[in-house]
């Protein structure tokens, strides 16, 4: 079990509404039950300097609010919610939140610290939405390498296919001691 699996297990223990079945059924409701509102926006109010924004976190009356770009596909919206939830739980300064500040997931990729944050948020979101162990178990149930299985599993967890292929690869890498596997 890697650190992201441990983090997500701890998050699920701390916030029972974030159990996998609840996340699959309605991630917005599950996140709302821990006091985090989610809303959609076309993001047109942001200056063009920001480029394309998939989502951001605003603070409203002391509570974080996740805004998702309304132009995204439904599964991409779910992923952005999970990623921003990770940002809130893992990085947002709980005791020093600036109520006049928006927190964006647009980090300067030239800084190593930001690369690590992006990586952490990707793996957190992937693990929260489609736990590695369960994805691999679902994949094994097909009995052979079947790329249609990837589509079916992605539909089950309501995530982009790359999340499923990366989870399977991650599982194989963990079990083989770190050897790289292609899926």
Identify the meaning behind each predicted range.
Residues 1-183:
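Active-site hotspot residues in diverse enzymes, especially metal/ion-binding acidic/histidine motifs
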């Amino acid at each position: 079990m890697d650190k992201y699996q441990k983090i997500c297990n701890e998050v699920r223990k701390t916030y029972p509404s974030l159990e996998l079945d609840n996340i699959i059924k309605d991630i917005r409701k599950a996140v709302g039950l821990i006091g985090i509102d989610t809303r959609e926006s076309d993001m047109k109010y942001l200056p063009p300097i920001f480029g394309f924004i998939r989502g951001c976190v605003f603070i409203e009356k002391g509570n974080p609010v996740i805004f998702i770009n309304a132009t995204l596909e439904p599964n991409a919206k779910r992923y952005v919610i999970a990623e921003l939830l990770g940002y809130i739980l893992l990085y947002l300064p709980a005791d020093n939140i600036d109520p006049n500040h928006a927190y964006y997931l647009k980090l300067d990729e030239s800084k190593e610290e930001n690369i690590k944050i992006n990586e952490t948020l990707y793996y957190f979101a992937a693990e929260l939405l489609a736990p590695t162990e369960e994805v691999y178990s679902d994949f094994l149930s097909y009995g052979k390498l079947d790329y249609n299985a990837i589509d079916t599993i992605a539909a089950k967890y309501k995530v982009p296919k790359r999340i499923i292929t990366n989870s399977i690869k991650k599982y194989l890498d963990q079990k083989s001691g770190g050897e790289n596997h292609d899926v």
